[in-house]
From Swiss-Prot:
The gene is leuA. One of its GO terms (cellular component) is cytoplasm. GO terms for biological process: L-leucine biosynthetic process. It is found in: Cytoplasm. GO terms for molecular function: 2-isopropylmalate synthase activity; acetyl-CoA C-acetyltransferase activity; magnesium ion binding. It is an enzyme of class 2 (transferase). It comes from Pseudomonas fluorescens (strain SBW25). Residues 33-307 form the Pyruvate carboxyltransferase domain. It catalyses: 3-methyl-2-oxobutanoate + acetyl-CoA + H2O = (2S)-2-isopropylmalate + CoA + H(+). Catalyzes the condensation of the acetyl group of acetyl-CoA with 3-methyl-2-oxobutanoate (2-ketoisovalerate) to form 3-carboxy-3-hydroxy-4-methylpentanoate (2-isopropylmalate). This is 2-isopropylmalate synthase. PROSITE patterns: AIPM_HOMOCIT_SYNTH_1, AIPM_HOMOCIT_SYNTH_2, PYR_CT. Pathway: Amino-acid biosynthesis; L-leucine biosynthesis; L-leucine from 3-methyl-2-oxobutanoate: step 1/4.
Length: 559
């Protein structure tokens, strides 16, 4: 079987929502929502190997540390393991004063009774009721009409009131989800929710939660936003209801649907860290939160150690985070492209600590989430001079002049093409050493002597010359400065085109780096590098580096 030529014979477009005066498109997110993690329930039930109690407790503590204030811990009536985990959290005092445990149940009385029993002794708790309301579930799964589906919700809501009254020491919050809300007729979803509201009788001081799931994402995110805005306009007692979002990622737009839903008036978001969950996953709370952060809004969640959070999530879920996952993937702050690297390097150079963040290609400062800058630029055959220069600057305090960056990038690219692999900073530095710092044939500097007299420099150098056997060469020169004097003493026509120098490090261990661009015998300019504790020695080494490289290239050209 293959894809249909006419998919409309099998699939139908989702109907649009008629709201000609919709307001959400012109709104922005101005404050963080109430966050609820469903990692330990929705996320856990989707794992090949669900978490054991040890992993669950580790995950719980991570969520608390991040700052999630409402955590759906389990489906206590589903298994003894889930029930016992809730008891452990309560009896061993793992629930901070500012954090509320949430549990899920269906509408049967035995399940509801077991759920409330699991929460005995909790200071406060959210009990979450759900039943599916969409046409396909009514027809295919439950064989119920609308009145039957509404009756399930209303009867269960009454049981919530009954069992909560038996444990008055707990501060209860009730939550209702018309599961498959986004595929349910809006008028019917409102009808069911209004009926539950009448039973629970919330007030502005003691609100209930209406959670509106895109249980299966079946339309573009703007339609979900329309559904949320319509619902918020029409639901009874809006001032006594917290509207919560619970999106999935079947179409790949869970984050967008959540953000537009918040613009449409929602107050709360349920999801999982890094988007774990059934099928393609729940909305990723981390991405939504850090999207807010990069817009200058405090998300009220702390991902200062995002890699530490990722480690816990990966080990507990036994699922690796994709290297391209927003904000946390191994490669999301990494540039291989030459033009990208050049822009990033220039951005870092100009970025000031107290200024607005404006580094190209990096929507967030990696340091804000505990990332180093080491992996920002990596070098392969697609890389250019900017990335190579950046790595040398960051790792070795080597600042190549611009024209030398171009020359050396060709050397690096030839090497990456040859080996077909990425090059690390140590490998690039080793290539710099081999190509420039160790370019000591045919002439290698052995020693030099410099004298200053009447504004002139007098230089005498000793070099080991190719084919000279045990006898070294001695050249003398005079000029306006050490380099000019050395050039004057060379038996070869040399023209200095450019010279740069800078310190490497500071204090007693500082060294000097010198860079020379010169033309030898009228040939094309080449570069040389010298590093030494003494700046004059470094400049002489740079000159011989360039001289030797030029002569070697001329020899190879003539061969």
């Amino acid at each position: 079987m293959s894809m249909l030529k006419d998919p409309s014979s099998k699939y139908r477009a989702f109907p649009t929502i008629d709201i000609p005066d919709r307001t959400w498109p012109s709104k922005t997110i101005t404050e963080a929502p109430i966050w609820c993690s469903s990692d330990l329930r929705d996320g856990n039930q989707s794992l090949i190997e669900p978490m054991d109690a040890v992993k669950k407790l580790r995950f719980w503590k991570t969520l608390v540390a991040v700052g999630v204030k409402e955590i759906e811990a389990s489906f206590p009536a589903a298994s003894q393991t889930d029930f016992d985990f809730v008891r452990t959290l309560i009896e061993d005092n793992h629930i901070p004063e500012d954090t509320t445990i949430q549990v899920l149940t269906q509408g049967r009385e035995d399940l509801i009774a077991r759920t409330f029993e699991s929460l005995r002794g909790a200071k406060k708790a959210i009990v979450h009721l759900y039943n599916a309301t969409s046409p396909s579930f009514r027809r295919i799964v439950f064989n119920q009409d609308k009145e039957g589906i509404k009756a399930i919700a209303v009867n269960a809501a009454k049981l919530f009131v009954k069992y909560a009254a038996q444990q008055p020491e707990t501060q209860w919050t009730f939550e209702y989800s018309p599961e498959t809300f986004s595929a349910t007729e809006l008028e019917f979803a409102k009808e069911v929710c209004d009926a539950v509201i009448e039973v629970w009788n919330p007030t502005p001081e003691h609100k209930m939660i209406l959670n509106l799931p895109a249980t299966v994402e079946c339309a573009t995110p703007n339609i979900y936003a329309d559904q949320i805005e319509w619902f918020g306009r029409h639901i009874n007692r809006r001032d006594s209801v917290i509207i919560s979002l619970h999106t999935h990622n079947d179409r790949g737009t869970g984050v967008a649907a959540t953000e537009l839903g918040l613009m449409a008036g929602a107050d709360r978001v349920e999801g999982c860290l890094f988007g774990n969950g059934e099928r393609t996953g729940n909305v990723d709370l981390v991405t939504v939160a850090l999207n807010m952060y990069t817009q200058g809004l405090d998300p009220q969640l702390d991902f200062s150690d995002i890699d530490g959070v990722r480690k816990v999530v990966e080990e507990c879920n036994q699922i690796q985070v994709h290297p391209r996952h927003p904000y946390v993937g191994d490669l999301v702050h990494t540039a291989f492209s030459g033009s990208h690297q050049d822009a990033i390097r220039k951005g870092f150079t100009q970025q000031k600590d107290d200024a607005l963040w404006e580094v190209p290609y990096l929507p967030i400062d990696p340091a804000d989430i505990g990332r180093s800058y080491e992996a920002v630029i990596r070098v392969n055959s697609q890389s250019g001079k900017g990335g190579i220069a950046y790595l040398l600057e960051q790792e070795y305090d080597i600042s190549l002049p611009r024209r030398m960056q171009i020359e050396f990038s060709q050397v690096v690219q030839a090497e990456t093409d040859r080996v077909g692999l990425e090059m690390t900073a140590p490998q690039i530095y080793a290539l710099l050493q081999r190509e420039y710092l160790q370019a000591n044939t045919p002439y290698a500097l052995v020693s030099h002597r410099l004298q200053e007299e009447n504004g002139n420099s007098f230089v005498e150098v000793e070099v080991s010359g190719k084919g000279q056997g045990e006898t070294n060469l001695h050249w003398k020169g005079k000029g306006n400065g050490a380099l000019e004097a050395l050039v004057a003493g060379l038996p070869i026509g040399v023209e200095i085109m450019d010279y740069n120098e800078h310190a490497i490090g500071a204090g007693t261990n500082a060294k000097a780096a010198a860079y020379i661009e010169l033309r030898v015998n009228g040939e094309r300019p080449v570069h040389g590098v010298g590093i030494d504790e003494n700046i004059t020695t470094a400049s002489f080494k740079a000159l011989f580096s360039a001289l030797n490289r030029s002569l070697s290239q001329q020899e190879a050209k003539a061969a």
